[in-house]
């Protein structure tokens, strides 16, 4: 789960693609 907390908040090594926060 790369998106946690705020909307569109990408953080963490697992989140390589920003698309996951679309």
Swiss-Prot record:
| Source organism (scientific name) | Conus striolatus
Protein name per the record: Mu-conotoxin SxIIIA
Q: Tell me the tissue specificity.
A: Expressed by the venom duct.
Q: Does the keyword Secreted apply?
A: yes
Q: List the disulfide bonds.
A: 2-15, 3-20, 10-21
Q: What else is known?
A: Negative results: does not inhibit rNav1.3/SCN3A, rNav1.5/SCN5A, rNav1.7/SCN9A and rNav1.8/SCN10A.
Q: Which GO terms describe its molecular function?
A: sodium channel regulator activity; toxin activity
Q: What is its main location?
A: secreted
The record's comment about this protein's domains reads: The cysteine framework is III (CC-C-C-CC).
- What is stated as this protein's family in its record? Belongs to the conotoxin M superfamily.
| One GO cellular component term | extracellular region
Its annotated function is as follows: Mu-conotoxins block voltage-gated sodium channels (Nav). This synthetic toxin potently blocks rNav1.4/SCN4A (IC(50)= 7 nM). It also moderately blocks rNav1.1/SCN1A (IC(50)=370 nM), rNav1.2/SCN2A (IC(50)=1 uM), and mNav1.6/SCN6A (IC(50)=570 nM). It is noteworthy that coexpression of subunits beta-2 or beta-4 (but not beta-1 or beta-3) decrease by more that 10-fold the binding potency of the toxin to rNav1.6. It is also noteworthy that the toxin is 50-fold more potent on mouse Nav1.6 than on rat Nav1.6.
Alanine amide PTM positions: 22
**Top-rank lineage group of the source organism:** Eukaryota
Q: Where in the cell is it found?
A: Secreted
Q: Which UniProt keywords apply?
A: Amidation, Disulfide bond, Ion channel impairing toxin, Neurotoxin, Secreted, Toxin, Voltage-gated sodium channel impairing toxin
